[in-house]
């Protein structure tokens, strides 16, 4: 039995994202008092009491004649078509506005089961005739922020959905096993959402020429070559000095948080915008968090054929110069809008994810250590004794982390550590991922 789908619809700033977070098993949506914060439809597992369902949050719709408004309507229409039940939300403080009337007509034409949810009702609330004129036979007053009225909402949802579907325990999602979480990050307008839409063949994410369309992290469950993948589209990261709007600060922190919990990060670069320090800063942040990384240069179709070879040479030089700690990062050149080379990106993610999870036996590690330290001797200490690394073992994966036991670890230089790490990459085929060494002092410094 699949989960029932409930879609939240309403004009901007009526509290859809607040209710989405309230019903979600974990918080997902950015909440802000600026209209239009949500710009894509977002999915999460929701729960009220014992009833579990799939919840969709939609962009706030208003009378907007520009292309952005048309795309918001398209996103909401798709979410309505997917729904088993619609919660049409209005603001109880401001009352019924002209946009509410237009939207209610828009929703009712699809003949879906629907509930009018009047939000921001912290006090006792009486429905006047304006609410009845919207044409919904079920009306509930709630405060999503404070959680009041949710029991009434639960009862109304159960009444609206087929009993055998809603009351029974829902079977978990059919996709099982490890989930590879891939975060797509980069500067604004690099083509992150276009890339994800091309991969899944669905206009799930709002795209367009306006920089900063995606304002929060959007998660999409997907399967690729029998692998369960969660694709996460993030807001574009700008330099801190250029982030002035408070909502964008929230979006930036949401993106950074997504990177922290990712397995692999796709760093999207705009081929028409030169590689900037901010791109390198994002890559360094990913590496410092211990994530695996794939660099993708998008809009490759817009680069002149005569300039591509020189572009690639300069690009590889910049990456190798500024990110020496992760030599061998996969770099792919794609056109998301033309779907050129996009599957190669997923293949690279699967490959580097495998390396990121690599486990090396202790015997092989110490055989390698003995050979490598003899090929390039460690420095001498005072008194003529040589620094030694006696033994090493792998303590964890994701990223591969190793403990090395030395008689005097303080004397091991950063350059010698880089020598060991780079040698390990080649010996054990571990390109493009962070490798961490932890030095531990042996009890007997003379051993």
From Swiss-Prot:
Domain KH-like residues, every copy: 358-443
GO MF annotations, alphabetized: GTP binding
Signal sequence segment: none
Annotated InterPro entries: G_ENGA (IPR031166), GTP-bd (IPR006073), GTPase_Der (IPR016484), KH_dom-like (IPR032859), KH_dom-like_a/b (IPR015946), P-loop_NTPase (IPR027417), Small_GTP-bd (IPR005225)
Gene3D superfamilies: 3.30.300.20, P-loop containing nucleotide triphosphate hydrolases
Keyword vocabulary terms for this entry: GTP-binding, Nucleotide-binding, Repeat, Ribosome biogenesis
Single biological process term from Gene Ontology: ribosome biogenesis
Domain EngA-type G: 4-165, 180-357
Subunit structure: Associates with the 50S ribosomal subunit.
Name assigned to this protein: GTPase Der
Protein's organism: Rickettsia peacockii (strain Rustic)
């Amino acid at each position: 039995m699949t989960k029932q789908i409930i879609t939240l619809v309403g004009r901007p700033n009526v509290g859809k994202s607040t209710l989405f977070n309230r019903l979600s098993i974990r918080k997902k949506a950015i909440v802000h008092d600026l209209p239009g914060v949500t710009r894509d439809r977002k999915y999460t597992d929701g729960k009220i009491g014992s009833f579990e369902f799939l919840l969709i949050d939609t962009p706030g719709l208003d009378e907007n004649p520009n292309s952005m408004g048309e795309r918001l309507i398209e996103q909401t229409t798709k979410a309505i078509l997917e729904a088993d039940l619609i919660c049409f939300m209005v603001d109880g403080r401001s009352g019924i506005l002209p946009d509410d009337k237009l939207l209610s007509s828009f929703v009712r034409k699809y003949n879906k089961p629907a509930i009018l949810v009047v939000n921001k009702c912290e006090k006792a609330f009486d429905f006047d005739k304006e609410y009845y004129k919207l044409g919904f036979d079920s009306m509930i007053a709630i405060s999503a922020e404070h959680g009041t009225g949710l029991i009434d909402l639960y009862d109304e949802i159960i009444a609206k959905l087929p009993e055998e579907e809603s009351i029974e325990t829902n079977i978990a999602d059919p996709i099982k096993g490890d989930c590879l979480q891939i975060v797509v990050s980069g500067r604004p307008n690099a083509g992150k959402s276009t890339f994800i839409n091309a991969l899944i063949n669905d206009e799930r994410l709002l795209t367009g020429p306006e920089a900063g369309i995606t304002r929060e992290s959007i998660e999409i469950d997907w399967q690729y070559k029998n692998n369960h993948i969660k694709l996460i589209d993030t807001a574009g990261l700008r330099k801190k000095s250029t982030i002035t709007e408070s909502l964008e600060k929230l979006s930036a922190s949401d993106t950074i948080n997504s990177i922290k919990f990712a397995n692999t990060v796709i760093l999207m670069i705009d081929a028409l915008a030169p590689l900037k320090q901010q791109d390198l800063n994002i890559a360094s942040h990913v590496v410092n968090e211990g994530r695996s990384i794939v660099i993708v240069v998008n809009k490759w179709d817009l680069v002149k054929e005569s300039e591509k070879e020189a572009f690639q040479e300069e690009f590889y030089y910049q990456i190798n110069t500024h990110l020496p700690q992760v030599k061998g990062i996969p770099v792919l050149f794609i056109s998301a809008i033309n779907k050129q080379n996009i599957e190669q990106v997923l293949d690279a993610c699967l490959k580097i994810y495998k390396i990121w999870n690599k486990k090396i036996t202790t015997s092989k590690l110490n055989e390698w250590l003995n050979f490598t330290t003899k090929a390039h001797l460690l420095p001498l200490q005072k008194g003529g004794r040589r620094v030694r690394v006696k033994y090493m073992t792998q303590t964890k994966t994701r990223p591969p982390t190793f403990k090395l036991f030395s008689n005097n670890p303080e004397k091991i230089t950063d350059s010698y550590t880089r020598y060991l790490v780079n040698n390990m990459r080649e010996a054990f085929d571990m390109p493009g991922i962070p490798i961490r060494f932890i030095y531990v002092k042996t009890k007997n410094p003379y051993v």
